[in-house]
Regions:
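N-proximal low-complexity "stem/linker" segments adjacent to membrane-targeting elements
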Residues: 1-23, 168-221
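Conserved nucleotide-sugar donor-binding catalytic segment
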Residues: 110-181, 339-425
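Glycine-rich, basic loop-to-helix element that forms the pyrophosphate-binding segment
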Residues: 60-75, 261-277
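Short, acidic, metal-binding catalytic loop of nucleotide-sugar glycosyltransferases
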Residues: 22-31, 220-229
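Short aromatic/hydrophobic "clamp" motif used to bind/position activated sugar donors
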Residues: 80, 282
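Short beta-strand/loop segment that forms part of the nucleotide-sugar
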Residues: 32-41, 230-238, 259-262
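Conserved donor NDP-sugar-binding/catalytic core segment of glycosyltransferases
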Residues: 87-116, 296-328
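A conserved acidic beta->alpha catalytic loop
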Residues: 37-46, 236-245, 286
Length: 427
């Protein structure tokens, strides 16, 4: 009975894919078809590979989540078997019944190495997959998270673990990027923190201009928190891309408020949001960046004991670099430092942040100052910090929950040469 359709995903090395395809001979009596989702096509295509089953190649350079979800709707076999990147089947699988009951439609495999352990879908009932789509690639920081988040969101009662080691890795590829991605995925487990005080209250505000490629990642990172933000508030600053189209889907979310206005720069966009803030503190998030899943939890732990004369809490940044293929690579963690005077503030080596403002302090300062330099469209963060530092203290804590994406369209890259002129203006 040929009732299994195999999906091979994220194989970047042709020889690895050939080995994975050859290993499917172990399930040949059950194997109906194989589909390779190939972001490197035609690089990994092997026309000379002769195997006793049909193989389709799907170009997945576009959004892998969309491509997968659409393709799964066309599958007619009872089961889908997933193989990822460096996986191949081993002989032991011949002795394992690859069947699932209706109340246990998911079988997982367990991965473990010196850096982390995790599980991913292995065999899933096609009928269940069709009703339970994957997140889109534009909703997650990196494509591997599509599968981590899918399995984490599922009820444990629907899952059965594979019996024994049915797969092995063709090669281990330990690197700092893979390690950082796994650590991020682990934070998605959504542990319950019932004993964490929900006071003081915390919102997040996002100003967006033409970041349609990344906006959903930023918003989803605010939604998928281990404890929720008290308020998520987003303004589109006159984008000319499809950002407003993406924002439409969030307008019915109970904890998200979405606004749009004509383009006047980030400072005016953030000021537009201030009257709608209802929380004691607010985190500023750029539309091309994203948060760790435990961001609210960690921030609130520090806010509980913060002195009244502190108007700003800040910590460290985790930097990632966007490459031409659309994937991201880990760059570094830049640790913050304590600011004791104005000179140290203006000589800070990188943007001070992440910035968690006391809302009342922002309102007393009448929001982000609109200055003549570049029509107030640059360095609004530095301007407000200089104003706040005259009257209040800042608090640095050693925590890392904010992910900065460096890409071709980053404003800080485009306008780095303006920084010295801006500093002269402040002095």
């Amino acid at each position: 009975m040929k009732d299994i359709h195999v999906l091979c995903i994220n194989y970047n090395i042709r020889s690895d894919l050939r080995k994975a395809l050859s290993s499917l001979n172990y399930i040949l009596p059950r194997l109906n078809k194989v589909t390779v989702f190939d972001s490197q096509y035609p690089h990994t295509f092997s026309p000379d590979l002769k195997l006793p089953f049909d193989i389709d190649y799907i170009n997945s350079r576009q959004d892998l989540g969309i491509t997968l979800n659409n393709y799964i709707q066309t599958i007619e076999n009872e089961y889908v078997l997933f193989l990822f990147t460096n996986d191949l089947l081993v002989d032991k699988i011949k002795g394992i019944p690859l069947t699932l009951e209706d109340d246990k439609p998911i079988m997982t495999v367990y991965y473990e190495n010196k850096d982390a352990h995790y599980k991913l879908p292995f065999i899933v009932k096609t009928s269940f997959l069709k009703k339970s789509p994957f997140l889109l690639e534009r909703e997650v920081p990196f494509r591997e998270l599509i599968f981590h988040s899918w399995i984490i969101d599922k009820d444990e009662s629907n899952i059965v673990a594979s019996k024994g080691n049915v797969i092995e890795r063709i090669r281990e590829t330990p690197n700092i990027t893979a390690k950082e991605k796994l650590e991020f995925a682990h934070k998605l487990k959504g542990n319950s923190y019932k004993n964490v005080p929900f006071i003081p209250t915390l919102s997040v505000m996002i100003s967006n201009f033409n970041m349609e490629k990344f906006l959903s990642v930023a918003i989803q990172s605010c939604i998928k928190q281990t404890i929720p933000f008290d308020q998520i508030i987003v303004v589109d600053d006159g984008s000319t891309d499809n950002s407003l189209k993406f924002l439409e889907r969030y307008k019915t979310h109970p904890n998200i408020q979405c606004f749009s206005k004509s383009n006047e720069g980030k400072a005016k966009a953030l000021n537009y949001l201030l009257p709608f803030l209802t929380s004691e503190f607010v985190l500023e998030l750029d539309a091309d960046d994203w948060l760790d899943p435990d961001a609210v939890l960690l921030i609130k732990k520090y806010l509980i004991n913060i002195p009244q004369n502190v108007s700003l809490l800040y910590g460290n940044f985790r930097y990632w670099t966007q490459n031409s293929s659309g994937d991201i690579g880990f760059s570094k963690i830049r640790k913050g430092k304590i600011i004791r005077n104005r000179k140290e503030l203006l000589s800070y080596k990188f943007p001070l942040g992440p910035r968690i403002y006391r809302t009342s302090s922002l309102i007393k300062e009448k929001g982000f100052p609109i200055i003549d330099f570049k029509e107030g469209r640059l360095y609004e963060d530095v301007t407000i910090l200089v104003h706040l530092f005259k009257k209040y203290e800042f608090c640095y804590e050693d925590f890392t929950i904010y992910n900065v994406r460096k890409h071709a369209g980053s404003i800080t890259k485009k306008n780095h040469s303006d920084w010295n002129d801006f500093r002269k203006l402040l002095n």
